[in-house]
Amino acid sequence: MRSYEKSKTAFKEAQKLMPGGVNSPVRAFKSVDMDPIFMERGKGSKIFDIDGNEYIDYVLSWGPLILGHTNDRVVESLKKVAEYGTSFGAPTEVENELAKLVIDRVPSVEIVRMVSSGTEATMSALRLARGYTGRNKILKFEGCYHGHGDSLLIKAGSGVATLGLPDSPGVPEGIAKNTITVPYNDLESVKLAFQQFGEDIAGVIVEPVAGNMGVVPPQEGFLQGLRDITEQYGSLLIFDEVMTGFRVDYNCAQGYFGVTPDLTCLGKVIGGGLPVGAYGGKAEIMEQIAPSGPIYQAGTLSGNPLAMTAGLETLKQLTPESYKNFIKKGDRLEEGISKTAGAHGIPHTFNRAGSMIGFFFTNEPVINYETAKSSDLKLFASYYKGMANEGVFLPPSQFEGLFLSTAHTDEDIENTIQAAEKVFAEISRR
């Protein structure tokens, strides 16, 4: 068994300093019933904790590090730009460069606004949708996470298409009432919602691949159906590609599935590991944003040279071939883990999209939040602890996906499969 004594000590101190001892809830490792592991450094596909333990990393800072940790070109570019200044509160040329690259690769984006987080991007996109259409309501999907903005922290009530209830204390019911929540991958529910509220729905926001219920791809025709319905009612279709952007495909999920939204939210990968967000879309809509239009949005560190540089150097290194390699690595990982899970009688289902992988402890197809919740959470917790002990770092939640990077090697994949074999063998003996 590995020692985590230094992590335990650090966590005890952190609990006196921060709510729950962490700066983001999932990092507390509560769903796997263990104390969090404190990390010290990373290189390539590996991450190292403060006790000196080494892991193959499939968290990758929750997605941004698509090139792996401390990529040489990204690090060198950051060193150079930091010598000139970390932030100016004035425009820089690197903002133009990253914007051009995003516009070139993301089909829906004609104009883009940089911000500092994914939450900021989605909140701004919703304000824009409401301001542009003159409507109030937003339709979202159960289990799709769009950051912690008040109008998006909503769960579904009873019935097929209901007005939301706050999912967190501190979210006023008045705000929640303007959010409609329906099941993911259920077009009929969307149609019913529009029949009832369509004239007041400003936009539909959706993760084109749901990444916060464990990676759930859209079913055939779902995204196109959303496109058709929103066009019929004059609502905006907003793709939240904070997670899927440049992870599903070279041209993002919208390029892969061939459905173009009105607005797109980005983050994670486009910052290369630094805080970032962006939203963009059709010029006629984006030009409503201040200072060219009346809809206000601003940010002190928006477009800061560090994040722009890291994002630019990251995207420059991604090619269409990168995504073919992600598919090959994912194929081998799924094949190997499925084989050993089946041999030990472990229920399991894989969902995948580009470099994103969902692994559930159920034999049932996972197509929405309800089916995702059928996964055996106790089994997941046992698997998580076992894999960590074998040197594989996974997201400490069943409802988060695994991420591949260009730094993951064939040896990493085989070692992960071997670790899973040991863990499943131990679980099956209990």
UniProtKB/Swiss-Prot annotation:
What catalytic reaction does the record list?
(S)-4-amino-5-oxopentanoate = 5-aminolevulinate
Biological-process GO terms, alphabetical: protoporphyrinogen IX biosynthetic process
The pathway where this protein functions is: Porphyrin-containing compound metabolism; protoporphyrin-IX biosynthesis; 5-aminolevulinate from L-glutamyl-tRNA(Glu): step 2/2
Report the top EC class in one word.
Answer: isomerase
The UniProt keyword set, sorted, is: Cytoplasm, Isomerase, Porphyrin biosynthesis, Pyridoxal phosphate
> Does Iron-sulfur count among this protein's keywords?
no
Tell me the cofactors it needs.
pyridoxal 5'-phosphate
- Give the Pfam families listed for this entry: Aminotran_3
Question: What InterPro entries does the database record attribute to this sequence?
Answer: 4pyrrol_synth_GluAld_NH2Trfase (IPR004639), Aminotrans_3 (IPR005814), Aminotrans_3_PPA_site (IPR049704), PyrdxlP-dep_Trfase (IPR015424), PyrdxlP-dep_Trfase_major (IPR015421), PyrdxlP-dep_Trfase_small (IPR015422)
Chief place where the protein resides: cytoplasm
Localization (cell) = Cytoplasm
Q: Which GO terms describe its molecular function?
A: glutamate-1-semialdehyde 2,1-aminomutase activity; pyridoxal phosphate binding; transaminase activity
Where N6-(pyridoxal phosphate)lysine occurs, the residues are 268
Database matches in Gene3D superfamilies: Aspartate Aminotransferase, domain 1, Type I PLP-dependent aspartate aminotransferase-like (Major domain)
HAMAP family assigned to the protein according to its UniProt record, in alphabetical order = HemL_aminotrans_3
Assembly behavior: Homodimer.
What family is reported? Belongs to the class-III pyridoxal-phosphate-dependent aminotransferase family. HemL subfamily.
What is the protein named?
Glutamate-1-semialdehyde 2,1-aminomutase
Gene name of this polypeptide = hemL
